[in-house]
Amino acid sequence: MKLAFLIDPIAALDPTHDSTVALMEAAQLRGHEIWIGEISDLSVHVGEPLGLLRPLKIEPVQWLGDRWQVANPWFTAGEAKRRSLHDFAAVFMRKDPPVTTAYLYATYLLDLVDPKKTRVVNSPEGLRHANEKMYALQFQSVVPRTLVSSNKAEIRAFLDELRAAVLKPLGGKAGEGILFLDPGDRNFNSLVEISTQQGQLPVMVQQYLPEAKDGDKRIILVNGEPLGAVNRVPTGREFRGNMAVGGRVEAVPITDRDREICAAVAPRLRQDGLFFVGIDVIGGYLTEVNVTSPTGIREIDRLNGVSIGDQTIAALEALVNQG
């Protein structure tokens, strides 16, 4: 198959951590042809979706038991050519968040891809629908108590009821802007005013789960099925476990409760065309559903001796072959 990946600038990607690289590497190892571009390389000509794309060859990284071995250079990209997206069996939309105006417009261009000819992963409509904070609220049986509001008095009352909470910007990523709220914090008003832009933007306020100190579990789902998990544990004085803010990773099993959560969300994920997803679970509760560019493949592979990328591409092959 020919596969196109819409990514961030490839020279800025870390091949030992980036899940997009892991997916492209797995696809190449399975014999597929890889092409790359950025969302600014998309266009539509007389109704035909096009991309200014480059063929890519990757030198696979190797885990040596205590470190990654990476070739220098680890990739070779060929000459850019303007190609119809219908030349590809699938197009992976792997631009990292935040969801900007440019990102949103790219999904509109990808709407012009005929799903009978080419599968877009994840679905552009699904990407627009699934705000990574709000999407989880559809599944009330498995989420912690949550308020979404821009009203300071309402947030204050909810915090007083909970005694401790976590505030999350609705457009944040990788733990950015997440705050721990304590009823006794004299900075409460300022924190809420800054986060809501003086009451103009809603934020999510979620019950603080004490189990967060033991880790934030990332579970990778492919076509609704859980393939693997990694635990991200806060370090030092940081209460967030995100890898981007220094959280350490450790192996963790997928529990029966995790499978209950996955079973609750899977039908909606499939309905919305969300093929590759990372959900976050703390203390047996679903806290986020990550759909734009979920990470965690390299860490799960390294800790468990598996290849989530290979399993993902195999699942894609099965879908494409079904037609």
Curated annotation (Swiss-Prot):
EC number(s): the record gives 6.3.2.3
Recorded catalytic activity of this chain's protein? gamma-L-glutamyl-L-cysteine + glycine + ATP = glutathione + ADP + phosphate + H(+)
UniProt keyword annotations, A-Z:
ATP-binding, Glutathione biosynthesis, Ligase, Magnesium, Manganese, Metal-binding, Nucleotide-binding
Q: In which pathway does it act?
A: Sulfur metabolism; glutathione biosynthesis; glutathione from L-cysteine and L-glutamate: step 2/2
Task: Identify the GO cellular component terms for this protein.
Answer: cytoplasm
What SUPFAM superfamilies does this protein map onto? Glutathione synthetase ATP-binding domain-like (SSF56059), PreATP-grasp domain (SSF52440)
Q: In this UniProt entry, which cysteines form S-S bonds? A: none
Fetch the NCBIfam families from UniProt: glut_syn (TIGR01380), PRK05246.1 (NF003573)
* Family statement: Belongs to the prokaryotic GSH synthase family.
Q: PANTHER family given for it?
A: GLUTATHIONE SYNTHETASE, RIBOSOMAL PROTEIN S6 MODIFICATION PROTEIN
Can you name this protein? Glutathione synthetase
